């Protein structure tokens, strides 16, 4: 049996650009792609914290250390500059692979610079 698990997450990145006429996808600062182990052209799910939109697209590379998060093409109608996004990828793992499984979680500041990286989400308490 395989289980689909959260593989990587960019948590609360800020949209810097929204380009309706650009060829689709989401451009992401190359340093963030590497930190989260997201490959160029990999499928990503985007969750817009500001308006609740959830959509799927693919990642493309933006200039390293630029802080760019640009939502492009038709998806530009789902996010505006300044919106907070969660960008996630998922992968399927066998039970044996799950023994070594750890997601790559990347947390950023207001300028989309890495401030913290973890491999677990803290337990939610009452």
Swiss-Prot record:
Keyword Secreted set for record: no
Protein family membership: Belongs to the PanD family.
Record organism: Methylobacillus flagellatus (strain ATCC 51484 / DSM 6875 / VKM B-1610 / KT)
Organism placement in taxonomy: Bacteria, Pseudomonadati, Pseudomonadota, Betaproteobacteria, Nitrosomonadales
Protein name: Aspartate 1-decarboxylase
Entry binding sites for substrate: 57, 73-75
One example GO MF annotation: aspartate 1-decarboxylase activity
UniProt cofactor note: Binds 1 pyruvoyl group covalently per subunit.
Keywords associated with the record: Autocatalytic cleavage, Cytoplasm, Decarboxylase, Lyase, Pantothenate biosynthesis, Pyruvate, Schiff base, Zymogen
Catalytic reaction list: L-aspartate + H(+) = beta-alanine + CO2
Modified-residue entries (Pyruvic acid (Ser)), positions: 25
Modification(s) after translation: Is synthesized initially as an inactive proenzyme, which is activated by self-cleavage at a specific serine bond to produce a beta-subunit with a hydroxyl group at its C-terminus and an alpha-subunit with a pyruvoyl group at its N-terminus.
Cross-referenced InterPro entries: Asp_de-COase-like_dom_sf, Asp_decarbox
């Amino acid at each position: 049996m395989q289980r689909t698990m959260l593989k990587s997450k960019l948590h609360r990145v800020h949209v810097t650009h929204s380009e309706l006429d650009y060829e689709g996808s989401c451009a992401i600062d190359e340093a963030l792609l590497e930190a989260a182990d997201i490959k160029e052209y990999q499928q990503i799910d985007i969750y817009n914290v500001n308006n609740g939109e959830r959509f799927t697209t693919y990642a493309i590379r933006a200039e390293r250390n630029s802080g760019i998060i640009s939502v492009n093409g038709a998806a530009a109608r789902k996010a505006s500059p300044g919106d907070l996004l969660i960008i996630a990828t998922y992968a399927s793992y066998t039970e044996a692979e799950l023994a070594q499984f750890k997601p790559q979680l990347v947390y950023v500041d207001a300028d989309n610079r890495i401030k913290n990286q973890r491999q677990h989400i803290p337990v939610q308490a009452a």
